[in-house]
Amino acid sequence: MKTLLDVHTHTIASGHAYSSLQEMTMAAKEKGLEILGITEHGPHIPGTCDPIYFRNLHCVPRQLYGIRLMLGAELNILNTQGDIDLDEDYWRMLDIRIAGIHSLCWQGGTREENTQGVINAMLNPFVQIISHPGDGTAELDFEALMKVSKETHTLLEINNHSMAPIRHKTVAAPNNLELLELAKKYKTPVIFGSDAHFSTMIADYSNIMPLVEKAEFPEELVLNYQPEKFMAYLKPTPEK
């Protein structure tokens, strides 16, 4: 099936990415996408944008070059309590809200404590996707996460960039294979994320596809192929 969306990407606003918003959107158009998510890093990542960046996102059109833009953030899960950065006022300004563990701003603990921290973030009604849970930054109980994913409609991401050889994350591929096998077992949708930091990386899932084949993962559980199903599955922004 054809990939029609990628909702985990970064522009120069994140401080360590190298393409503009317009360059990213044009690349998405060239690749035939319908939906592009641009999710700049939350404020605990050094060098990322100031919170005022998110406050002013209303200036950007949500249809550009024929692409639906979803402008949001990759928020940071900060600790084993599941606290994330920014706050509710900002979360409400975002079209899409991803949360993930990053070593630069994560205070972890045991496997059980780490898992509970991610689960607490998943129980946050604003968090729609957990980014790169399989990258090995924190030891996690993937089966426990998958059960909560199914219960809460908080998608677990299969992250392409974390498996790039240059990243030297040796556990990422086996961890992501386990996530796919569990998603298949529990019939739970997943989302593929390029985690693109440059325009040519958009919708690059080349490190994911061998795992998909190995797991014999059903296409109907991959929301990147089904934009309408993806939009319907996402947690809505809670009412005030």
Give, region by region, the residue ranges found by the protein language model:
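Extended substrate/RNA-proximal surfaces in nucleic-acid metabolism proteins
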Residues: 42, 47-158, 213-222, 229-240
